[in-house]
Amino acid sequence: MKFKRNDTITQGEKTYTVTDFLGEGGQGEVYLVECEGSEYALKIYKDHVSADFRYNLKNNIAKGAPSSEFLWPIELLDFDDGDLGYIMDLRPKNYVSFVSYLTGKNKFADKSVMLKWCISLCTAFKKLHEEGYSYQDLNDGSFFFDPDTGALLICDNDNVTADKKNLGVLGKMRYMAPEIVRGDKTRSGSVQLPDVHSDRFSLAVILFMALCLGNPFEGERLKNYDIVDEEAEYEMFGKDPVFVYHKTDKSNRPIRGYHSAVLRRWAYVPIYIKEAFHRTFVDGLRDRENERTTPLEWIKLLSRYRDELITCGACGYDYIVGYAEKKRYTECPSCNTPTKDFCTLHIGRSDIALDLGKRVYEPHVDKFSSKYGSVVGRVVSNKNNPSLW
């Protein structure tokens, strides 16, 4: 470790005191530091970084975070020995890693909260791309959530660069766009590097994993390999990726007894969400620039999904009423209790299944609003007669 507890670091007029070692990754070490009564995280790079990397980091700090969801670098630290580090805000303790959700250690309070997190994720990347950036390395370790509220935080933002520019980071296997895995050539003859279009692919992978708890390209073809090594991963995620719910190529369906969560959850995903995944993971392999679902498209689709949710009064399971399905659900998918009566609120093009606690958001009443997390109304029970809403 470069620092030990109570070491001090002076930068200009500020002095940071190291209070704890938080951990390390491939790039560097992270410390808990204190300055003027506030706590921050300090990341120190293990190796000397390039001048381009330093310039990019400095420029990102000057421009500031695209939104509050990004744990963005806020101050650059240069050391006499040539090492580089930066200060960022500390992740609050009520936030847990997305990885812990995938492994079952932590859960969202309910499906509506999970969808709020997904919408926030898409909104954050919409803003990032609008600022002219691409994230370039979306993976399961990049995100955190508050299990109770669905609030989002995004870490590892030091690799974010201007779109079409790359500083050496390609991404993490299982999340990278296939053309990045393969090292395809662009029209100009250069190697295809991460950009906004590869971000869109990786974002769809994260959303699929959030909704279905599995990877969209891991299915029956896993049986072709004695061990999933680099060669196997290259074939599954680069050379010849096949979406597990490809409409015509059924060679890679989820394995019963192994991908149980995917099989169970996919069955109750709304058809318009399924179509968006198919477009990205099938058509988007052929046409990366036009057929990958954009963050804004995801926001609208996921908001529609949230509008359709109702809660089973018997077991508390959240499921959709099925406005867009050929056959509406007449019983709870979890406990088979018959679907209770509910009212539908029609606002413009939105159909909102009313349930106790259901929220109405600003875009419902203002078609020009992009505040998909801003609540303007909520279904509550009558104080004098709780059976009335």
Per-region residue spans from a language model:
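Forkhead-associated
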Residues: 356-389
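Activation segment/activation loop of eukaryotic-type protein kinase catalytic domains
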Residues: 141-184
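Conserved C-lobe activation region of Hanks-type protein kinase-like domains
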Residues: 207-274
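Conserved catalytic-loop aspartate of Hanks-type protein kinases
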Residues: 199
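Catalytic-loop of the protein kinase fold
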Residues: 125, 129-147
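ATP-binding glycine-rich phosphate-binding loop
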Residues: 2-36
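Conserved beta3-strand ATP-binding lysine motif
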Residues: 43-46
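Conserved structural core of kinase catalytic domains
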Residues: 71-117
